[in-house]
């Protein structure tokens, strides 16, 4: 089933969880892992995926995407092959298809397990 993603992000490398992410979290929510994107960060929390997307020339305008795990209907993961550099996560929600490409060295199975744990326990 091939569909055009409504959103697409590329995670470049794992990074420390930014200290300012605490302001985005609700009571009882914890940041679990963070990854650099080309311009900002994606944070996997105990309740959702948060992606901060810096925009414009200066990067001062920031759009924040929040994808609650409870809204993920189906997902798939694809590991990098011999000639492929990137692995990939595909998530399907009621809003549409979201694609997350993973840079070399990012453990797609770890993220798959994290999403599985969060989605299945959020139901």
Stretches with model-predicted labels:
Residues 112-115:
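C-terminal output/interaction extensions
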Residues 24-41, 45-97:
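Phosphoinositide-binding peripheral membrane targeting modules
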Residues 101-103:
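Short, exposed beta-strand-loop hairpins at the edges of beta-sheets
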Residues 1-42, 96, 105, 109, ...:
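Anionic N-terminal interaction surfaces
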Residues 119:
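IQ-motif-like calmodulin-binding regions
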């Amino acid at each position: 089933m091939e569909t055009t993603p409504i959103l697409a992000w590329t995670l470049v490398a794992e990074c420390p969880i930014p200290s300012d992410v605490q302001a985005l979290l609700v009571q009882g929510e914890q940041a679990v892992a963070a990854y650099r994107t080309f311009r900002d960060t994606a944070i996997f929390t105990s309740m959702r995926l948060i992606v901060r997307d810096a925009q414009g020339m200066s990067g001062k305008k920031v759009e924040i995407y929040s994808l609650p795990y409870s809204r993920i209907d189906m997902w798939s993961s694809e590991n990098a092959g011999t000639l492929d550099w990137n692995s990939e996560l595909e998530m399907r929600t009621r809003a549409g298809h979201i694609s997350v490409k993973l840079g070399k060295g990012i453990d797609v199975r770890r993220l798959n397990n994290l999403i599985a744990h969060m989605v299945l326990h959020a139901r």
